[in-house]
C-alpha cells in the first residue's frame, strides 16, 4: 500500500511546479507604514532609546487614525463652506478642532513651519 500524502504536501508540490514551469515569482505587495519616520523622530528626541515592533505597530495605527480624523474633519469643513478643495486652512482648522489646547498650538506651529519650508524649497 503506498504512503498517504497529506493535502499540504500536495499543495506545496503543485506550487513548486507552477513556479518552475512559468518562472513567474509573485511579488509581495509592499506594506506602507510610517515606521521609518516615527523612528527618525524617536532618534531626534531620545537618541539612545529603541522601540519594539509591537510599539511601532501601535504608533503606526495611531498616526493613521489621527490622519483619517484630520482628513475627515477637513473634508467636512470644506463641504460646510461649499469648497471643493481642502487647503492648509481647512487642515489647520481641523487640527484646532480635534486636538486639545496646547497640543493644537504646537501642531499648528509645526505645520506652518513645514508648509513654509516646503514652499521656500520650490
Curated annotation (Swiss-Prot):
Entry-linked InterPro entries: Histone-fold (IPR009072), Histone_H2A/H2B/H3 (IPR007125), Histone_H2B (IPR000558), HISTONE_H2B_site (IPR055333)
Record's subcellular location: Nucleus; Chromosome
Region entry Disordered, spans: 1-31
Alphabetized UniProt keyword annotations: Chromosome, DNA-binding, Glycoprotein, Isopeptide bond, Nucleosome core, Nucleus, Ubl conjugation
Pfam name, any one: Histone
PTM: Monoubiquitination of Lys-117 gives a specific tag for epigenetic transcriptional activation and is also prerequisite for histone H3 'Lys-4' and 'Lys-79' methylation.
Glycosylation sites: 109
A molecular function (GO) term: DNA binding
One GO cellular component term: nucleus
Biased composition (Basic residues): 9-31
Protein name in UniProt: Histone H2B, gonadal
Originating species: Patella granatina
Amino acid at each position: 500500500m503506498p504512503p498517504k500524502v497529506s493535502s499540504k504536501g500536495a499543495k506545496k508540490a503543485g506550487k513548486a511546479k507552477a513556479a518552475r514551469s512559468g518562472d513567474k515569482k509573485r511579488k509581495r505587495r509592499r506594506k506602507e507604514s510610517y515606521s521609518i519616520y516615527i523612528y527618525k523622530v524617536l532618534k531626534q528626541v531620545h537618541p539612545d532609546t529603541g522601540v519594539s515592533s509591537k510599539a511601532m505597530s501601535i504608533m503606526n495605527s495611531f498616526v493613521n487614525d489621527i490622519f483619517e480624523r484630520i482628513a475627515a474633519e477637513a473634508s467636512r469643513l470644506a463641504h460646510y463652506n461649499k469648497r471643493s478643495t481642502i487647503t492648509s486652512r481647512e487642515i489647520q482648522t481641523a487640527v484646532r478642532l480635534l486636538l486639545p489646547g496646547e497640543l493644537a498650538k504646537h501642531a499648528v506651529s509645526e505645520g506652518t513651519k513645514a508648509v513654509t519650508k516646503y514652499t521656500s524649497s520650490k
